[in-house]
Amino acid sequence: MVLTPVSPVVLVILDGWGYREELVGNAIAAAHTPVMDSLWQAYPHTLVYTSGKAVGLPKGQMGNSEVGHLNLGAGRIVPQELVRISDAAEDGSLAANPALVQVYEGVKQRGTKLHLVGLCSDGGVHSHLDHLLALLDMAKSLGVTQVCVHAITDGRDTLPTEGKTFIQRLQDHLDRLEMGQIVTLSGRYYAMDRDRRWDRVERAYRVMTSDENIVDTPAWKILANGYAENITDEFLPPVRIAPGAIAAGDGVVFFNFRPDRARQLTQAFVDPNFKGFERSLISPLDFVTFTQYDASLSCAIAFPPQNLSNILGEVIAAKGLKQLRVAETEKYAHVTYFFNGGIEDPLPGEDRILVPSPMVATYDQAPAMSAAQVTQEVIAAVEKGVYSMVVVNYANPDMVGHTGQMKATIQALEAVDRCVGQLLQSVLQMGGTLLITADHGNAECMVDEQGNPWTAHTTNPVPFILVEGEGVKIPGHGTDVALRDDGCLADIAPTILEILRLPQPAEMTGRSLIQPLEVDLRPNRTPVRVRL
């Protein structure tokens, strides 16, 4: 019979809570966070890397929530889709991709239009401009002449007004190829909603599927006009600037590689049972997505999912132990789908709690978001005493940090700090262990070198704090522990397994962050009282 460990391990992911020593523009340094400050002083802590090759991204590439949670749950460095697709573009195999070739040849034979849809930036979080340029090169080489680009502008994973640079680079490439045109523009606020705010998605969809209300203005000028009215890239209202509506018989390639913000717009095009808003299904329509956005969607996939076996959740489930995932809407997919390596359905013994995010235009209007409700759900679950592992995400540092609003971000951080304090008391009373970390940086850098708002992620490391409960929580140590200072997110799953006394599978190549000190064994510390 498998015995459930006496007390839980609770992994707290402070989304976007990075570490940076510089004080200028550092919302975390400016915020009053007595709980996190006390824990950092009182308990074993270290910094872990969350960007670049440490998480399977190109060198110097900032991390993101999808990548972070994927590495956290997999317990290994997972080669990311950005690298996978970029390699295909560089070595020429992209042009031979069966799913892409089929849609390209199809529109060529039918004499219909090819539509390239996606986020037009080099942010590398949801897409990369180089991938779009490679798709255009492929169209040129295959003799596809009717090419319509539906450019989604960023301003969130890039600077707020950097879109003009990306659009100009795209237009220059089209001019060199003497083929294709930009036909629509839409800020990601509309085209890439992930919180079922269908009114936003509908505005992008209507513009993409209708040749009415054409604004005869170059794309760069549309953006410049928006900047003059304080409308940044993210919030650019959808607009059609040239003919080329998506119609029956056409082919579509959605070149975003991250699923969560591409899913809803894709559903509007391909789901025969779509209920988000009134529309007639465009059929037939050859629709290809770069990666699998949702297993239930009937569309071709250029880069099918990679198989990850023996991830952390599977190891827990295989031992007959119960686990829980809790997050509000904005990060729910991350603690479930991404943390489970792309598995949509819950694992055996895995429970999930979704707390609705507040329905506001931008989260600086509600910086506390739903953190208090998330905390209460976790406390209630921990006190049941049935879960061996609990994974909880606090979205505030990232989601409010993305607004670029310093005051609101400070308020968000302080709200999360209070919640961590409340959760801490509950976990320690149960004799549990609290592991506090983040998936990437954001809130620690709110301005760029010129003092302008910085709304993107960072390449900074993030904190990792190990908070012990009343009992002997680190098996085999019975004393203070030291933590390695060269770790990455992939090392956290092995750390959890060590605490739970579970063997680490061979596929999990990360290394536990725990290393015992060379001292005589003594009883565990009395937990330090945290200033609340």
Curated annotation (Swiss-Prot):
Q: Which GO terms describe its biological process?
A: glucose catabolic process; glycolytic process
Q: What residues does Mn(2+) 1 bind to?
A: D398, H402, H457
Query: According to the UniProt entry, what is the EC number of this protein?
Result: 5.4.2.12
Catalytic EC class: isomerase
Detail which positions bind Mn(2+) 2.
D15, S65, D439, H440
Catalytic activity of the protein: (2R)-2-phosphoglycerate = (2R)-3-phosphoglycerate
UniProt-annotated catalytic positions: S65 (phosphoserine intermediate)
Give GO cellular component annotations, separated by semicolons: cytosol
An example molecular function term from Gene Ontology annotations: manganese ion binding
Which cofactors are required for activity? Mn(2+)
The cofactor note from the UniProt entry for this protein is: Binds 2 manganese ions per subunit.
Check the record and name the CDD domains matching this protein.
iPGM (cd16010)
Question: What residues bind substrate, as annotated?
Answer: H126, R156, D157, R188, R194, R258, P259, D260, R261, K331
SUPFAM superfamilies xrefs: 2,3-Bisphosphoglycerate-independent phosphoglycerate mutase, substrate-binding domain, Alkaline phosphatase-like
Q: Pathway it belongs to?
A: Carbohydrate degradation; glycolysis; pyruvate from D-glyceraldehyde 3-phosphate: step 3/5
Keyword annotations of the record: Glycolysis, Isomerase, Manganese, Metal-binding
Q: Which Pfam families match?
A: iPGM_N, Metalloenzyme
The family this protein is said to belong to: Belongs to the BPG-independent phosphoglycerate mutase family.
Q: What does this protein do?
A: Catalyzes the interconversion of 2-phosphoglycerate and 3-phosphoglycerate.
Q: Which NCBIfam families does the entry link to?
A: pgm_bpd_ind
**Complexes and interactors:** Monomer.
Q: What is this protein called?
A: 2,3-bisphosphoglycerate-independent phosphoglycerate mutase
**Lineage, highest ranks first:** Bacteria, Bacillati, Cyanobacteriota, Cyanophyceae, Gomontiellales
